[in-house]
Regions:
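Short alpha-helix
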Residues: 164-178
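Conserved beta-strand signature within the Rossmann-like core of class I S-adenosyl-L-methionine
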Residues: 148-155
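A C-terminal cap/extension of S-adenosyl-L-methionine-dependent methyltransferases
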Residues: 169-173, 183-243
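Conserved class I S-adenosyl-L-methionine
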Residues: 1-37, 40-49
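A short glycine-rich, Lys/Arg-flanked "PGG" loop and its adjoining helix->strand segment in the class I
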Residues: 122-147
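Class I SAM-dependent methyltransferase SAM/SAH-binding core
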Residues: 50-93
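A conserved beta-strand element that flanks and buttresses the S-adenosyl-L-methionine
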Residues: 105
Length: 243
């Protein structure tokens, strides 16, 4: 078993079991593997919770964990001390100057913004950008990200969950309003017929079988498929975005 995978799971078990992502092949394991390459940068994790993702990043980086939950921020501070700065704030009003960050992480947050708009009856029908809270999040991220910066984004794919998650079209429309360049990937794709087996979580049965023959890193890397302009069935989206 990979050291990083085991270390992350142990952190959840030790510090916050209820915050675990619930899936050993979650797209956030792949996200962390990409973030580990970053050195000597200013990094903001929006909605970073107890700080698991930030804690896995290189110590040469200046890391800020932003969240609305005071309990999660307290937990992060107790576990990681001064290696991570913690700020209590909303995702729609980021308390930073323009062009402040080299890297910004927005992991499994947009679906929360969409849910807020649906429950608050804020959805703008017949508008290409119909979710105002999502638009505010992207507008703020664009403002505080440096011109040569990069946004790392993950969010569940609604084709799998069939709830208030984002669709491919909703996500790409929202990105294009504020950003010119992005690379989108479908994470953990699955065949159409597996929809019939959704309640059995069929999409994740294949990675579990592969684990008997390959290590965790090899499997999560194999689950990433490039966007070719056609929506695909997948569990999640992974996106790298630039101005």
């Amino acid at each position: 078993m990979d050291d990083s995978f085991q270390r992350i799971k142990e952190k959840f078990e030790k510090f916050s079991v209820k915050r675990y992502w619930g899936d050993d092949f979650d797209v956030r394991f792949y996200l962390i593997s990409q973030l580990k390459k970053i050195q000597e940068k200013s990094i903001l994790d929006i909605g970073g919770g107890v700080g698991i993702i930030s804690s896995e990043l290189g110590e040469s980086n200046y890391k800020i964990n932003l969240d609305l939950s005071l309990d999660d921020l307290k937990n992060c501070n107790q576990n990681y001390g001064e290696s991570i700065s913690n700020i209590n704030s909303s995702m729609t009003l980021l308390p930073f100057k323009d062009n402040s960050f080299d890297c910004i992480i927005c992991s499994h947050l947009l679906e929360i913004a969409k849910d807020i708009d649906i429950k608050s009856n804020l959805v703008v029908k017949n508008d290409i950008n119909q979710y105002p809270t999502i638009e505010k999040v992207f507008k703020e991220i664009h403002r505080i990200m440096k011109n040569d910066g990069i946004l790392y984004l993950t969010t569940p794919n609604n084709t799998y969950y069939k709830s208030s998650k984002l669709t491919y079209q909703e996500l790409t429309n929202s990105i294009k309003k504020y950003f010119k360049k992005y690379s989108l990937f479908f994470y953990n794709t699955y065949p159409n017929f597996s929809k019939k087996h959704r309640k059995f979580n069929f999409a994740n049965s294949i990675p579990k079988i592969k684990l008997k023959f390959r290590n965790h890193s090899q499997i999560i890397n194999s689950l990433v498929k490039s966007d070719e302009g056609i929506e695909r069935e997948s569990v999640s989206f992974y996106v790298e975005i630039r101005k």
